[in-house]
């Protein structure tokens, strides 16, 4: 990904970065799924707190708060909705194969 980003335009580089970050969100969900299966560590409300956190670190949420406007071409981590979706995808499936953000619509 890093090599592709170096050869891409700024917008394309940002899009690759978003895909990589969303994949990381999905993998975090996969980790939480499997850890919960082994240890039952998730308590009531934990998943909602994780979703709320994912929402609050979306590029659109952060840009709106900081600048008062949203510039999607400048996203490097994904929108709030994307981050919630991909974390939830990993959490619900527990399957790494479902985290292929490079070959799916994001």
Indicate residue ranges for each PLM-predicted region.
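A Zn2+-metalloprotease active-site environment signal
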Residues: 1-76, 84-85, 92-106
């Amino acid at each position: 990904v890093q090599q592709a980003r170096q050869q891409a335009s700024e917008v394309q580089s940002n899009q690759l970065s978003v895909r990589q970050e969303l994949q990381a969100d999905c993998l975090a969900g996969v980790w939480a799924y499997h850890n919960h299966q082994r240890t039952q560590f998730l308590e009531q409300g934990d998943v909602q707190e994780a979703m709320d956190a994912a929402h609050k670190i979306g590029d659109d949420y952060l840009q709106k708060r900081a600048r008062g406007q949203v510039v999607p071409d400048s996203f490097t981590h994904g929108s709030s909705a994307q981050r919630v979706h991909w974390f939830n995808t990993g959490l619900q499936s527990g399957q790494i194969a479902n985290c292929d953000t490079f070959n799916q619509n994001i």
